[in-house]
Amino acid sequence: MRDFVIVGHIAKTTPDFSLEDLPGTSGRIDVLCRCVNSAFMLSHGIRRDVRCHLILMGGPEPKILRFDGSRLRHLNPDERSTAALIKRALSIDASPSWRESTPGIYIRKGDLRSLLESLRDEGQRLYYLREDGAPLSESVSDGVFVLGDHTGMTGDEEHLLDSMGAETVSIGPLSLHADHCIVIVNWMCDNAALRR
């Protein structure tokens, strides 16, 4: 299983944003929508072996959305319809346990630490994407890939990742948009799987 974790530092945790003005009203959920689409979209379908987790930090309490490719339905390649799926998920009451809003989309209360602990307990290896990390190995085909939103990761988040044993890796020396990083990681992992 390949997992992507994107931290949305100002992303709203309530559904009171306009689909007509995502950048201005949602806490930049548009950035996260692009990440979701990059994680799943294929030419004529979606990836079934990927999960994408959005950590929304811009509300009174953080929430986590999980998109699970094995069950995912209704995902289209545009930001607006992806934002509508997020808005629908945010309209249900989140609890400490996962609740499904639409097929393959789940919500729960939680933060980066709680999510990474649960993924690590599944036996997943953690990778933190950062420009100055070690080059991502061409043999990596699965794992948890953690990225920041347009603001990057905070020092506390980087310390947490380090304390949990995340390997800091890079796909190149330049700072790229998170959604572009996801496309590149998917490509690298697809190629690694072919070589096995």
Curated annotation (Swiss-Prot):
The alphabetized UniProt keywords are: Cytoplasm, Methyltransferase, S-adenosyl-L-methionine, Transferase, tRNA processing
Q: What are this entry's molecular-function GO terms?
A: S-adenosylmethionine-dependent methyltransferase activity; tRNA methyltransferase activity
Q: Does the keyword Cytoplasm apply?
A: yes
GO aspect biological process, one term: tRNA methylation
Report the EC code(s) recorded for this entry: 2.1.1.257
Which subcellular locations apply to this protein?
Answer: Cytoplasm
Q: Could you give one GO CC term from the UniProt record? A: cytoplasm
| Signal peptide per UniProt | none
- The residues that hold S-adenosyl-L-methionine are 129, 148, 181
Which residue pairs form cystines in this protein? none
Against HAMAP family, the record matches this protein to: tRNA_methyltr_TrmY (MF_00587)
- Give the similarity note: Belongs to the methyltransferase superfamily. TrmY family.
What name appears for this protein in its UniProt entry?
A: tRNA (pseudouridine(54)-N(1))-methyltransferase
